[in-house]
């Protein structure tokens, strides 16, 4: 018998041959005559899997201002950053979301995680240096003078920059638009992108005509109508004239970003994108396909050491039943669109694919949220923990004169008269005009009183399920509130057992199954490397899914 190890030769002077890591192979070799050759095929080879250690940088594109920028980092500056990453021996460049976030045309739109379209790119990232020069010399000089002023600022003036860029793009469109829209390259691109581009363009036009992105307030076209598509794509129609400006801008953005992506590949730099968990509730995505969203709730996060009252992001939550019914088409398209610009991506708040913290629309803080989906308790289940269920007591804000006295001191009587009314026995309840946090936010000017009233609204032991009123969820962090301290020691112990079971055990396998309905479809949609941001209140099932699907997780050595 003969023994052998397979080897792979690397034809590079710095690399040694790679040898198999398995035991030597034992083979029976017949006697061969001179000149005879025998070939043997092995079905498996055992080589060490490469375990590279790659360094990278995370940066928002808007911060990449260079000498030639127009007051904000753009896709041309991204190429400069790619050069620096490659020069320093790094391999990964991650950027924050670059989708359009334009709702009000003010600085409030500057938050990159509140996109109005999962496809459209933000017009502020257009690199004017890659466009034809303005033929109007006077206008060109004016814009150059403004560019120098905006670029000299220590911080980005979001409103002035975006106003100037919109005006410049309008002039370029008037100058070059007809030629670009008639080009073969544009027509080919438009055919591939029009499924989202046409509704997006109409949404932008209607947003500006109506002076608001809240489509529920528009005079007409409060949802996308597929019958409008024909007029929006016909160059002979009135609707096309204004919509085509947005086609033109998105075409420029797509070409510049794709060029930056290709440049990164040439430099052997992995360009990594960022997919926000939510979308703006007044954005084009919700307007075009409202069936995919729950508008009677807001996404957020439960309390943590950095946010004692939880977080309210304001995004609508997803109607996963509708999304799963059509194979998660909305998400698959989103990921496939990302693949045009990136080689890897970060899933923001991957916990949202297991369950999302859903907050009532009338809430400001996150304490009144509940996980959706999740397994709420029936009355019988609650009582099985040893806690006699009293709905009127457990599900109403606990407010008495004694509570107000502890919170407001000498002002308690005035507060009681202004905001409350008698209810049952010693209890008070909010007057109708102050019975939600949003009403309080709108009507109460004093910040201290406002925050105190917020806390009283959320002073409940249980929350009714948002979909099934016969089910109940324990209110998170209620152990710090007045209602909890009215319980007997036995009831506190019973509630704590129920509380720990609900948040840390009861839903674990249920949430695992929920994630596995969604994430495999999305990961298989592209060849991009998947990374997950899995910080927060992480259930035990999250590492199971992350490991099963070979998703890279976020590992931190330390946190402040």
Which functions belong to the PLM regions below?
Residues 13-16:
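Short hydrophobic alpha-helical segments enriched in small aliphatic residues
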Residues 3-10, 347:
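Targeting/processing segments of secretory and organellar proteins
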Residues 19, 23, 28-560:
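Catalytic cores of glycan-processing enzymes that make or break glycosidic bonds
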């Amino acid at each position: 018998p003969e023994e052998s190890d397979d080897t792979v030769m690397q034809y590079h002077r710095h690399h040694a041959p790679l040898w198999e890591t398995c035991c030597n192979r034992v083979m029976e070799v017949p006697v061969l005559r001179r000149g005879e050759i025998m070939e043997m095929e092995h079905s498996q080879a055992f080589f060490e899997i490469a375990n590279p250690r790659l360094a990278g940088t995370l940066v928002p594109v808007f911060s990449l201002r260079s000498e030639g920028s127009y007051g904000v980092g753009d896709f041309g500056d991204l190429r400069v950053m790619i050069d620096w990453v490659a020069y320093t021996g790094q391999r990964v460049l991650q950027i924050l979301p670059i989708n359009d976030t334009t709702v009000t045309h003010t600085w409030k739109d500057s938050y990159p995680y509140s996109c109005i379209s999962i496809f459209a790119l933000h017009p502020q990232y257009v690199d004017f240096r890659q466009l034809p020069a303005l033929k109007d010399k006077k206008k060109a000089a004016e814009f150059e003078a403004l560019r120098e002023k905006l670029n000299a600022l220590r911080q980005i003036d979001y409103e002035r920059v975006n106003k100037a860029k919109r005006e410049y793009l309008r002039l370029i469109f008037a100058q070059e638009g007809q030629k670009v829209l008639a080009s073969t390259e544009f027509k080919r691109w438009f055919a591939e992108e029009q499924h989202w581009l046409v509704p997006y363009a109409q949404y932008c036009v209607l947003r500006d005509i109506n002076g608001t992105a809240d489509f529920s307030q528009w005079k007409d076209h409060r949802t996308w109508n597929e019958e409008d598509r024909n007029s929006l794509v016909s160059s002979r129609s009135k609707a096309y004239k204004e919509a085509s400006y947005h086609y033109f801008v998105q075409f420029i953005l797509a070409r510049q970003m794709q060029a930056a992506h290709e440049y990164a590949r040439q430099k052997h730099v992995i360009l990594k994108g960022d997919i926000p968990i939510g979308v703006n509730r007044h954005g084009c995505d919700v307007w075009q396909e409202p069936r995919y969203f729950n508008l009677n709730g807001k996404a957020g996060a439960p309390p943590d050491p950095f946010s004692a009252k939880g977080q309210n992001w304001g995004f609508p939550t997803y109607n996963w039943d509708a999304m799963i019914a059509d194979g998660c088409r909305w998400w698959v398209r989103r990921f496939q669109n990302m693949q045009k610009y990136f080689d890897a991506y970060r899933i923001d708040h991957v916990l949202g694919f297991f369950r999302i913290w859903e907050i009532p629309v009338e809430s400001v803080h996150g304490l009144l949220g509940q996980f959706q989906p999740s397994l709420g308790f029936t009355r019988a289940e609650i009582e099985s923990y040893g806690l006699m269920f009293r709905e009127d007591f457990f599900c109403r804000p606990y407010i008495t004169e004694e509570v107000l006295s502890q919170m407001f001191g000498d002002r308690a009587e005035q507060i009681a008269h202004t905001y409350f009314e008698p209810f049952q026995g010693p209890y008070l309840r909010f007057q109708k005009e102050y019975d939600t946090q949003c009403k309080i936010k709108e009507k109460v000017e004093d910040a201290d009183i406002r925050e105190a009233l917020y806390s009283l609204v959320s002073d409940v032991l249980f929350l009714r399920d948002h979909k099934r009123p016969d089910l109940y969820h324990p209110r998170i962090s209620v152990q710090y509130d007045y209602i909890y301290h009215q319980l007997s020691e036995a009831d506190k112990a019973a509630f704590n057992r129920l509380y720990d079971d609900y948040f840390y055990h009861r839903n674990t396998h249920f949430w695992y199954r929920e994630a596995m309905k969604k994430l495999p479809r999305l990961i298989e949609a592209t060849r991009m490397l998947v990374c997950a941001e899995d910080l927060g209140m992480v259930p035990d099932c999250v590492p199971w899914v992350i490991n099963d699907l070979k998703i890279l997780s976020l590992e931190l050595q330390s946190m402040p």
